[in-house]
Amino acid sequence: MPPGSGRGGRRRAESLVREVLGLAGLRPSDRLGQHFLIDDRAVGEFLKPLEKAAAEGIREALEIGPGAGSITLPAAEVLDRIVAVELDNRLASALSRLAPARVAVITGDGVSHAAASQAPLVFSNTPFNLSPAIVEALAVNNRVAAAVLGVQYEVARRMTARPGSRDYSRLSVLVSLVFHAELAGVVRPQAYYPRPQVLTAVVTLRRRRRWRSLYARALELAGCAFTQRNKKASKVLRRCLEAAGCAPPPWLDSLGDARVWMLRPEDFVGLAEACRG
């Protein structure tokens, strides 16, 4: 029975976590932000979009931070090839002993692998402190067509926020420039061992636009502007442009009384183009 459809809620995932932690001889590390998924229904929140991707022909994936393999092993039942990158070499060694041949477990830094991966699909129950860095690495890597990410709920709100909303931020601009983002599910703290103190959200990303080098400057300007998100955009952007050594474009004053949080991602791209000359 697939993990997402088990009536007992936990069962397979919890048993797997116990087995892998036992093989590795370790306890969860606060320093590494380790929280292991032990609820089968929660695993199903990740599996559903992975199954959809597989049905569309996307069958090779990179997993960042497989941990004890709660998502890895059931995902291997629907995908042809998974490279799972784990920072903790003890976990990587233990998981590799249980993983099928189609799963290659390696030790390494997930952000670096996200930026360089050849796989069209990436999935991760992300360490919360690395979520924004992972998203940015995926955005820059045009080979990545889709991603399924578990992130802190507040981060998910920023990833899916639209201009004019309270959660709209530099991260929102980054995601919107290249991805279509959807909130696919919510996982409660009790689905993890040990329990985190926050909700986790599952976010799906689908690439809608290739990354351009111009976007780096657009995000630099957005990062500067959102430090004063409630101020008049024209004044804030003028200071940000001058700090970047760029002349403000003539249309800047046409923003009127608009605030920074009202600007569209395309506005920042337009500023970057003006800055380029």
From Swiss-Prot:
Enzyme Commission number(s) from the entry: 2.1.1.-
Q: SUPFAM superfamilies from the xrefs?
A: S-adenosyl-L-methionine-dependent methyltransferases
Q: Any coiled-coil ranges, and where?
A: none
SMART domains registered for this protein in UniProt = rADc (SM00650)
**Gene Ontology molecular function: any one:** rRNA (adenine-N6,N6-)-dimethyltransferase activity
| Database matches in InterPro entries | KsgA/Erm (IPR001737), rRNA_Ade_methylase_Trfase_N (IPR020598), rRNA_adenine_dimethylase (IPR011530), SAM-dependent_MTases_sf (IPR029063)
Q: Does the keyword Transmembrane helix apply?
A: no
UniProtKB keywords: Cytoplasm, Methyltransferase, RNA-binding, rRNA processing, S-adenosyl-L-methionine, Transferase
Where is the protein localized? Answer: Cytoplasm
Q: Which family does it belong to?
A: Belongs to the class I-like SAM-binding methyltransferase superfamily. rRNA adenine N(6)-methyltransferase family. RsmA subfamily.
What is the role of this chain?
Answer: Specifically dimethylates two adjacent adenosines in the loop of a conserved hairpin near the 3'-end of 16S rRNA in the 30S particle. May play a critical role in biogenesis of 30S subunits.
Q: What's the name of the protein?
A: Probable ribosomal RNA small subunit methyltransferase A
Name its species. Answer: Aeropyrum pernix (strain ATCC 700893 / DSM 11879 / JCM 9820 / NBRC 100138 / K1)
